[in-house]
Amino acid sequence: MDDKQHTSSSDDERAEIATSNQDQQTNSSKRVHLKRWQFISILIGTILITAVITVVAYIFINQKINGLNKTDQANLNKIENVYKILNSDYYKKQSSDKLSKAAIDGMVKELKDPYSEYLTKEQTKSFNEGVSGDFVGIGAEMQKKNDQIMVTSPMKGSPAERAGIRPKDVITKVNGKSIKGKALDEVVKDVRGKENTEVTLTVQRGSEEKDVKIKREKIHVKSVEYKKKGKVGVITINKFQNDTSGELKDAVLKAHKDGLKKIVLDLRNNPGGLLDEAVKMANIFIDKGKTVVKLEKGKDTEAIQTSNDALKEAKDMDISILVNEGSASASEVFTGALKDYNKAKVYGSKTFGKGVVQTTREFKDGSLLKYTEMKWLTPDGHYIHGKGIKPDVTIDTPKYQSLNVIPNTKTFKVGDDDKNIKTIKIGLSALGYKVDNESTQFDQALENQVKAFQQTNKLEVTGEFNKETNNKFTELLVEKANKHDDVLDKLINILK
């Protein structure tokens, strides 16, 4: 995420689904325990840290409980011997901590898994701050994928969203410095800072790059928001955190009190959160004893089921779920369950597609290992990783909200032929200017509209689409997108 990690979290970061040992102990009557894994924190995306063990203890436990075959023991001995040799006999003095970290980093890197990572004590501290719920940053959920830092989704109402950051944007620089090769936590640390200070992100969208300046703010992730729109209740769920299920229940009861029979659960750009909450939330609409999600590792499968009767006030409601490519992790668990049981109709666009689960181990020295341990499936056995969940009814996002960033290092004028010129035309049309085609040609008609745009916005009137014009153009499109929710409006019209 900014600010959080999901392993995608928020700053980034990515969505998460988690069950903690503590939660399992205090809520044992309401949860199906994971047999072999019941003492391990399970995460999808952002991680909830619970187990604290030393490296020595970890090795001992594995030897004692699981056992090591001769090959494994030989490999472990080899690693130990190499460490001792380099630490004591290398001609230059070596840091034992750095050697240890390098060995662990090498093993994790060999997994070729963007969700597995080893964090130092400092990185773990930053990580913990990121998943606390309150932080100073830009409010952008991010993940590391293919050695790139990618935005999973900007949080609703966050500085990142207001600045135009979108899902799947790739961050290449922070304050002009390349982040190539940096760990997710390091990037998070760079993006964060003091309240009311600014950070400049270089964003790559498609083949183009653009600098985006964002003011850091104190971010508080509010779980659920309810609004009445005519005869439809719109419940926006921003994240799956502690007591989100309680907030959702309250919102549903409020809608019932308002006499509403149709409910929209808006999960767009929801990066996920706690698995327990996703199960409890599904239980509001799904009866007791039903499987909400299946966790699978090898040949072992464990079903997590609902433990209570469905909320009676919700039984007669017509439920619609609205999703997009920023809906990930727990959002997909919840959506997949209601879809499989025909409790809701899904609208919007295909979801992110994250169907693997991470486990964390925090060591005594404060460092932490996060690794993928299993995958999850919907009640009907659908594996959505890399595929996402397709909506029952597609509602396309307006063209202007899906445009690539136009590089502000280029100037376009009459006679030019470039794909970005099509973007200019679509954007100007969305802003109310008369554009009669969407070609890649910068013609006289477009020059006239650019001049009109410049004059209206008190810019130098040149007819050329330069840096200043581009910046204002982008600002107004972002403002329009934030003020007018075309997708939600279309859905409400469908439900009338």
From Swiss-Prot:
GO terms for molecular function: endopeptidase activity; serine-type peptidase activity. It is an enzyme of class 3 (hydrolase). Residues 124-206 form the PDZ domain. GO terms for biological process: proteolysis; signal transduction. The keyword Protease applies. GO terms for cellular component: outer membrane-bounded periplasmic space; plasma membrane. Its EC number is 3.4.21.-. Keywords: Cell membrane, Hydrolase, Membrane, Protease, Serine protease, Transmembrane, Transmembrane helix. The active site is at S329, D340, K354. Residues 1-27 are annotated as: Disordered. It is a single-pass membrane protein. The keyword Hydrolase applies. Residues 18-27 have a biased composition (Polar residues). Residues 1-16 have a biased composition (Basic and acidic residues). It is found in: Cell membrane. SMART domains: PDZ (SM00228), TSPc (SM00245). The chain crosses the membrane at residues 39-59. InterPro entries: ClpP/crotonase-like_dom_sf, CtpA/B_N, PDZ, PDZ_6, PDZ_sf, Peptidase_S41A, Peptidoglycan-bd-like, PGBD-like_sf. It holds the Pfam family Peptidase_S41. NCBIfam families: prc. Belongs to the peptidase S41A family. This is Probable CtpA-like serine protease. The lineage of its organism: Bacteria, Bacillati, Bacillota, Bacilli, Bacillales.
